Swiss-Prot record:
Organism (species): Arabidopsis thaliana (Mouse-ear cress)
Residue(s) carrying 4-hydroxyproline: P30, P32, P34
Post-translational modification: Contains 4-hydroxyproline; hydroxylated on Pro-30, Pro-32 and Pro-34. O-glycosylated on hydroxyprolines; noncontiguous hydroxylproline residues are glycosylated with arabinogalactan.
A Gene Ontology cellular-component term: plasma membrane
PANTHER family according to UniProt: ARABINOGALACTAN PEPTIDE 1, ARABINOGALACTAN PROTEIN 21
Subcellular location: Cell membrane
Glycosylation site residues: P30, P32, P34
Protein name: Arabinogalactan protein 21
Amino acid sequence: MEAMKMKMMVFIMVVAVAFSAATAATVEAPAPSPTSDAAMFVPALFASVVALASGFIF
C-alpha cells in the first residue's frame, strides 16, 4: 500500500512539473512583430493571382 502511494505521488509530481513547464514555455514565447508578415505579402498576392488566373483559364 505504501509503495502505491509513493508511485502515485511521484506521478502527480511529474505531471505537475510537465504542466508547469508547458505553461511557462507558452508564456515566455515572444510575440511576433507587427511587420513580420510584410515579407509574405508579395508571395501571397502572387499565389492568389496565379490561383485566380488558373481558375479562369481551366
